């Protein structure tokens, strides 16, 4: 089992469809909707610290990140119908950096570990999928962090695939537990 199953968990938290529900999800232009949701709260609660975060995926809507991109705001990594955003410019104290576009940067798991935010939008990408057995599994080819991947040959071992899946699930767990006041996918 990949989770700590609790039969007493109140699953109604996922059924609340009201606008102010703690948990929710968007379909169709998800990056636009997550950013709009974050910005709407920012307009009403200027003191709130809200961010959009992302798994370490690449490919269709996200370009691969490189440490050489650093603080160059002209290099963007996330693209959706004319909306372009970049990864967080630093992993240390990212929430408090003085970058002009800091609130608009997309945070990675490495930038938000141990940090509580008010509202969090989380982009889940093609680095994880539901397999034919209905179970979550990682997709190494769509994961953009070369420091934590097995080689292609090593991924043929089911134990390595399982370990990598746990690693990716743990990254999403970190992202999905940052929001005090709400989370949207």
Predicted regions and their residues:
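C-terminal accessory regions
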Residues: 100, 105-185
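Conserved helicase/translocase motor-coupling segment
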Residues: 1-136
């Amino acid at each position: 089992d990949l989770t700590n199953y609790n039969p007493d968990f109140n699953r109604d938290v996922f059924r609340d469809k009201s606008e102010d529900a703690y948990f929710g999800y968007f379909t169709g232009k998800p990056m636009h909707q997550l950013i709009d949701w974050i910005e709407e709260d920012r307009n009403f609660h200027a003191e709130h610290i809200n961010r959009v975060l992302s798994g370490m995926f690449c490919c269709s809507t996200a370009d691969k990140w490189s440490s050489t991109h650093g603080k160059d705001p002209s290099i963007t990594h996330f693209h959706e119908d004319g909306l372009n955003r970049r990864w967080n410019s630093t992993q240390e104290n990212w929430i408090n950096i003085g970058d002009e576009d800091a609130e608009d940067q997309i945070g990675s798991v490495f930038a938000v570990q141990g940090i509580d935010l008010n509202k969090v939008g989380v982009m889940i990408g093609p680095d994880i999928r539901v397999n034919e057995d209905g179970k979550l599994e990682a997709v190494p080819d769509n994961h953009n962090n070369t420091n934590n991947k097995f080689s292609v040959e090593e991924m043929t071992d089911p134990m390595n695939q399982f370990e990598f899946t746990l690693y990716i699930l743990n990254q999403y767990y970190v992202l999905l537990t940052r929001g005090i006041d709400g989370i949207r996918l």
